[in-house]
């Protein structure tokens, strides 16, 4: 038995368009006045007037989430708040998303913010996620966006200090809907069409093979020119054959003559229009004594990839509040979600979809992927797998046929989740009330992964995994709030709280490989011998308790001072951790005479100290599972060979402490021109001290490393939020809104440690490197002299450096959005354009497709004179003239006038033109070469993130069909247009999902654009 390591990532969200508001001057879209009654929800789930806040917070109303049409809260918040960076893993149904607020704050821990729903912390974990496998979900996707009343993003340390070691990455505070006075019923239905928004283009001129000649089962597409063939394959009728399930026969090819290019047909085998139905029903009621909100929803999505790609989420919610008497109020918030999905294999994965699809030669037809192989003697092999590397299916293919990946492999996830929050509020004094809140968040996830016999690679003999993950968090929260009068001009609100939390994750399951019965689907461990069975289990738990106090001073209703302090104890470190904060807001216009130019102004400053708790159990030296990996996504499990565990070579540290983040923030919120223009400015800088690392120690200690508080990081940045009321009248309103965020991150100190691997491969990875931004791209570089010029070989080609180093930065220079919304009579509209500039990405797919001769640039041609051809050489040192004389029509040919036309291109690296052809791209110039620097690409983008239109039908129409509350219809488009220089898929992607490693593309599944049509009835 082995102990399976779980990757647990606490993930998160952002902010929405037509409902955005920066705390301060009440700058919600469509608002042109200072609403002194506007409230925001604080880190502990209570409310506070936005005027009195001295730190940055962004707010979105629930309708802004729903109008986006996204399945998940995270995705719905994209583009709506400054310095809130959200990256979707892929376009797969239910795929998770990474959220980062004001840069990265830890190396070994999670950079995802804390999620608080109705005052209790909940999980947004994403278990799994690596360079291969399937894209994982974020557990925040279990929430129905239609149930949400508002979302607040607390960015800085001062805003979130009461959460101590869970607050370094900010806090997302979600408030769900409550019942309202009277009775109302709402039903909405949405139909959506999803399409691939960006694809790799494949060349269709040259066929399978090498050296300009067709070669059966060859990996590459460096073969002959397809158009110059004779038109029909020559078949050996007496040879081996493959008979597809539909009866189509494929014989042994003696000579390739077929001129057909199958790129379009193979593409259509993979992609379709994805379809989604989303239905929501909610009931709201309320009176003076009680209120109730109940909802049911069903999200049913079929992905853009044909086959087993789907996602279905069914939710139910009940929120209830009862005033028992004038002192006691009780309530219950309860949510249930059932999420079932099928995912498609991706990434560095011989069984992955894009790897097999994109590498397929343009002259190979992928249509018939399953059937029976017959030897020349007529001996059959059933359930044979036909692909371009095994065109007769005589053995497991090197790479899966996409049809096999889509239809034969199974990767299911079945999640059941409950979130319960009973709460009681007792007013024990006219100026004091006590809130008692219990939270319980529990989920189970059963994942089944099945590779039938004849899948590619290590799965050739079949494998099956049944994986059960159970996660829960229980919290008990007591809050006492009081109001005090300290004089005629000074008011004080006090809060004292205690919070206990217990979190645990339990994982149990097993794998079976090398199936005994090979010709049947066997989802059972019995179909494997004992030595090929691999059970696993793991358990982790974390306890913490925290006491805190908050003092809010209000001086003359214009100066607002908040002081907080929290003391926390946790099972992951020894001593208590103290996190103080202070914030000050001053309404400048209270002391100035208002003018037409300046309607409102508030200055704010805040500082705070929060932390990141060390990972569980590193205070002790543990035993770990034995295994080994080449660094390219494979893994050798020692438990299969008699060596399951060993004492870790990394020594525990009983003195380990939380990582400490100290942050200072300065800002201003202003309204100009009679409240028509609202602006928010924030500058911040923070320092993270004592980030946890495994630091090398002398071998004489018996260990190679020890956990220590050894690293320092820092962030600094600027945020601008804007809202402009362009037109305001009874029938027509028009508003311009937007935000801009810039963050600069630096790994200041690693205490002499080598660059820390975060994610990726042996050749290219994302790392923490001292003196560079967190997540910097690391890999092989070109050799250069002291002046920076390339060092060339004798033929004029660049050479590889013997040293690896930083080759790119996945972090953007800035990110922002600009929106326009408004209404004309019953018509409402919203347009949101978002941009991300200066970020780089490793285009691993692009590099490998160069190696395979698939990229269009590898099929380009050039013509030179015979004299020039005698002096131009390829990477082997062979002249162009010599290659043409060899007569391979896919390499170079002699024209009637004596000139020579060749496949490839010419490039001058500094010593004259050289010939870039197969021999360059399959060595140093391709994706399997040692120089990753050449595949670092600009991944900047600008997109139409969202376009929505809705129309409320005339009341007479709705009354005629007995819908008194009204009927509205709407349209939403997502990612309708994308402008980017990045080659291949939408650069809003990441190979390793929500991990700390960023900027990696290696056969990632593509992104989507969507068209949604909605109708809503209010009864």
Give the role of each language-model region.
Residues 23, 112, 277, 319-328, ...:
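Extracellular/periplasmic, surface-exposed regions of secreted and cell-surface proteins
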């Amino acid at each position: 038995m082995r102990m399976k390591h779980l990757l647990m990532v606490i993930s998160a969200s952002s902010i929405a368009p037509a409902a955005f508001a920066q705390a301060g001057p009440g700058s919600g879209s469509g608002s042109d006045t200072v609403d002194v009654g506007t409230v925001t929800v604080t880190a502990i789930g209570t409310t506070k007037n936005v005027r009195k806040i001295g730190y940055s917070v962004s707010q979105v109303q629930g309708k802004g989430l729903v109008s986006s049409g996204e399945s998940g809260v995270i995705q719905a918040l994209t583009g709506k708040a400054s310095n809130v960076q959200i990256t979707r893993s892929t376009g797969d149904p239910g795929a998770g998303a990474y959220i980062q607020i004001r840069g990265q704050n830890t190396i070994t821990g999670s950079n995802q913010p804390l999620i608080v729903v109705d005052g209790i912390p909940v999980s947004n974990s994403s278990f799994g996620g690596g360079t291969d496998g399937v894209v994982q979900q974020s557990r925040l996707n279990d929430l129905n966006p239609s149930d949400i009343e508002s979302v607040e993003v607390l960015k800085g340390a001062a805003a979130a200090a009461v959460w101590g070691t869970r607050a370094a990455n900010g806090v997302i505070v979600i408030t769900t809907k409550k019942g309202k006075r009277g009775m109302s019923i709402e039903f909405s239905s949405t139909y959506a069409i999803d399409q691939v928004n960006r694809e790799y283009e494949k060349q269709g001129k040259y066929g399978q093979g090498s050296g300009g000649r067709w070669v059966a089962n060859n990996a590459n597409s460096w073969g002959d020119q397809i158009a110059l063939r004779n038109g029909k394959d020559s078949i050996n009728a007496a040879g081996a054959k493959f008979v597809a399930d539909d009866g189509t026969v494929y014989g042994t090819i003696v000579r390739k003559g077929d001129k057909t290019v199958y790129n379009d047909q193979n593409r259509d085998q993979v992609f379709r229009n994805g379809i989604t139905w989303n239905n929501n029903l909610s009931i709201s009621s309320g009176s003076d004594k009680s209120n109730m909100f109940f909802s049911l929803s069903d999200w049913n999505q079929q992905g853009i990839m044909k086959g087993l790609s789907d996602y279905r989420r069914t939710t139910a919610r009940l929120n209830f509040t009862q005033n028992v008497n004038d002192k006691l109020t009780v309530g219950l918030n309860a949510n249930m979600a059932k999420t079932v999905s099928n995912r498609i294999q991706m990434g560095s994965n011989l069984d992955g979809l894009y790897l097999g699809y994109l590498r397929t030669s343009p002259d190979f037809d992928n249509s018939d992927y399953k059937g029976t192989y017959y030897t020349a003697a007529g001996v059959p092999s059933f359930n044979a797998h036909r692909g371009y590397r095994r065109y007769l299916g005589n053995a497991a293919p090197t790479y899966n046929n996409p049809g096999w990946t889509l239809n034969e492999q199974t990767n299911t996830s079945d999640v059941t989740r409950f979130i319960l929050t009973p709460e009681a509020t007792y007013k024990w004094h006219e100026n004091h009330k006590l809130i008692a809140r219990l939270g319980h968040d529990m989920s189970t996830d059963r994942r089944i992964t099945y590779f039938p016999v004849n899948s590619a690679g290590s799965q050739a003999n079949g494998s099956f995994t049944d994986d059960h993950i159970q996660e829960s968090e229980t919290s008990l929260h007591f809050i006492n709030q009081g109001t005090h009068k300290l004089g005629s001009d000074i008011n004080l609100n006090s809060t004292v709280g205690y919070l206990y939390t217990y979190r645990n994750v339990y994982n149990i399951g097993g794998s079976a490989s090398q199936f005994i019965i090979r010709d049947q689907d066997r989802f059972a461990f019995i179909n494997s011998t004992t030595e090929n069975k691999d059970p696993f289990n793991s358990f982790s738990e974390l306890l913490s308790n925290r006491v805190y106090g908050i003092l809010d001073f209000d001086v003359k209703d214009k100066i607002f001072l908040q002081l907080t302090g929290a003391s926390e104890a946790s099972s992951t470190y020894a001593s208590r951790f103290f996190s103080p904060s202070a914030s000050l807001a001053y309404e400048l216009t209270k002391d100035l005479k208002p003018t037409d130019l300046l309607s409102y102004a508030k200055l704010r400053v805040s500082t705070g100290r929060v932390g990141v708790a060390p990972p569980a159990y590193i205070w002790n030296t543990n035993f770990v599972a034995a295994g080994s990996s080449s660094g390219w996504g494979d893994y050798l499990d020692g438990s299969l060979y008699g060596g399951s565990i060993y004492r870790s070579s990394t020594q525990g540290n009983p003195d380990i402490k939380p990582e400490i983040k100290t942050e200072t923030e300065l800002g201003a919120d202003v309204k100009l021109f009679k409240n028509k223009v609202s602006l928010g400015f924030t500058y911040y800088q923070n320092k993270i001290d004592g980030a946890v690392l495994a630091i090398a120690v002398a071998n004489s200690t018996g260990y190679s490393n020890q956990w220590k508080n050894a690293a320092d990081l820092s962030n600094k940045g600027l945020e601008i939020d804007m809202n402009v009321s362009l037109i305001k009248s009874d029938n027509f309103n028009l508003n311009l809104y937007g935000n801009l965020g810039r963050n600069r991150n630096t790994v200041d100190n690693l205490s002499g440690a080598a660059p820390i691997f975060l994610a990726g491969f042996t050749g290219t990875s994302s790392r923490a490197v001292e003196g560079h931004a967190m997540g910097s791209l690391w890999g092989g570089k070109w050799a250069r002299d002291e002046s920076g010029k390339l060092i060339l070989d004798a033929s004029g080609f660049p050479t590889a450096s013997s040293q690896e180093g930083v080759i790119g930065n996945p972090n953007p220079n800035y990110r922002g959005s600009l929106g326009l919304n408004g209404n004309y009579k019953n018509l409402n509209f919203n347009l949101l354009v978002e941009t991300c500039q200066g970020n780089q990405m490793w285009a691993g797919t692009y590099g490998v497709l160069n190696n395979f001769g698939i990229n269009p640039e590898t099929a380009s041609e050039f013509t030179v004179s015979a004299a020039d051809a005698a002096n131009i050489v390829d990477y082997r040192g062979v002249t162009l003239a010599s290659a043409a004389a060899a007569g391979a029509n896919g390499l170079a040919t002699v024209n009637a006038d004596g000139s020579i036309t060749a496949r490839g291109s010419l490039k001058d690296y500094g010593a004259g033109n050289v010939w870039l052809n197969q021999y360059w791209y399959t060595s140093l110039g391709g994706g399997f070469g040692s120089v990753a620097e050449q595949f670092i690409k600009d991944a900047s983008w600008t997109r139409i993130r969202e376009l929505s239109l809705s129309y409320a039908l005339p009341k007479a129409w709705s009354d005629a069909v007995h819908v008194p509350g009204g009927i509205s219809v709407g349209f939403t488009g997502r990612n309708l247009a994308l402008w980017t220089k990045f080659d291949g898929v939408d650069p809003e992607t990441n190979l390793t999902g929500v991990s700390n490693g960023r900027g990696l593309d290696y056969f990632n599944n593509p992104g989507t654009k969507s068209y949604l049509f909605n109708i809503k009835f209010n009864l």
